[in-house]
């Protein structure tokens, strides 16, 4: 009798990826976030699909269609809030996943890391376009402000912005194309995630010690399957707590006002998960400089492997680097807070200092601390 999991072309791929996959025996709960991101993506695609059945991407009816989903569609309110808060859970898992990769030196898997950065950019683009769709005040003004940043590009900037808008302002054409892209991008993300896993399985998983674990591997199923299911249950519990008890906690009240091009909200700000980058953008007085800093705040992840000066892979046994890592986390929290504050003293100064610290830690302090640690170990 043939062994189907090991002989059937399709089942074999699933078997080698999720069942018989050799995994290090010591990976901690920080390795759960990959599977949680997969669950978040599936959840977002499913809830998004049901929302798309009732949503209309027209400036005159978009806001009303979202209201209709919440009021008239069976369980429409829960689908809508699962989708909106699911995005927040997605980004929480993303930040944890990237942070884990930085802490334990997983960025030495260059292909996996670079596809991960591409995934991060794609998810951010998708989330931004999704935020525009309800066509509330913050949707409209957020879209206007963020797309307008492209006008800082010399020579072609203005033409590029008008090309993206499909006219001379954010209007029906913009909303329609944003809906089209918001619908298609999650499937592109799914394809990229498969490639991400493909490259990861070429090298095998990293582990907290950063040492090779070839001599100590265990099968993914049942050990990590059960561990992942526990993580998934906790994720769903947290999401349901958010959706059922405080669905608007992470949203903006301005988005419950229909979009009005004649009335600007007092503080234009994106969703909470973009606030750190928004704070870096605002901390530079020059428009082009701000846009470059905004892009670099994420793109800097691609430079991290080049700045790895330590002779150890993981930060597990590197106390100086650990202190700097947690300082970076605190700095990102400060930037997130500043991004939601008005542009006035003392927030401007705090934002500028936090932005300088962010780039200093990653570009200067981390490599120097690694060299010092090497010296202490007499390597």
Curated annotation (Swiss-Prot):
Positions bound to heme b b566: 97, 196
Cofactor annotation remark: Binds 2 heme b groups non-covalently.
One Gene Ontology cellular component: mitochondrial inner membrane
Record flagged with keyword Magnesium: no
Main localization, broad class: mitochondrion
Membrane topology of the entry: Multi-pass membrane protein
Example of a GO MF term: metal ion binding
Database matches in SUPFAM superfamilies: a domain/subunit of cytochrome bc1 complex (Ubiquinol-cytochrome c reductase), Transmembrane di-heme cytochromes
Pfam families cross-referenced by the UniProt entry: Cytochrom_B_C (PF00032), Cytochrome_B (PF00033)
Subunit structure: The cytochrome bc1 complex contains 11 subunits: 3 respiratory subunits (MT-CYB, CYC1 and UQCRFS1), 2 core proteins (UQCRC1 and UQCRC2) and 6 low-molecular weight proteins (UQCRH/QCR6, UQCRB/QCR7, UQCRQ/QCR8, UQCR10/QCR9, UQCR11/QCR10 and a cleavage product of UQCRFS1). This cytochrome bc1 complex then forms a dimer.
Superkingdom of source: Eukaryota
Stated name of the protein: Cytochrome b
CDD domains in the record: cytochrome_b_C (cd00290), Cytochrome_b_N (cd00284)
Signal peptide: none
Protein encoded by which gene: MT-CYB
GO biological process: mitochondrial electron transport, ubiquinol to cytochrome c
Binding site for a ubiquinone: 201
Note: Heme 1 (or BL or b562) is low-potential and absorbs at about 562 nm, and heme 2 (or BH or b566) is high-potential and absorbs at about 566 nm.
Keyword Heme assigned: yes
InterPro entries linked: Cyt_b/b6_C, Cyt_b/b6_C_sf, Cyt_b/b6_N, Cytb/b6-like_sf, Cytochrome_b, Cytochrome_b_C_euk/bac, Cytochrome_b_N_euk/bac, Di-haem_cyt_TM
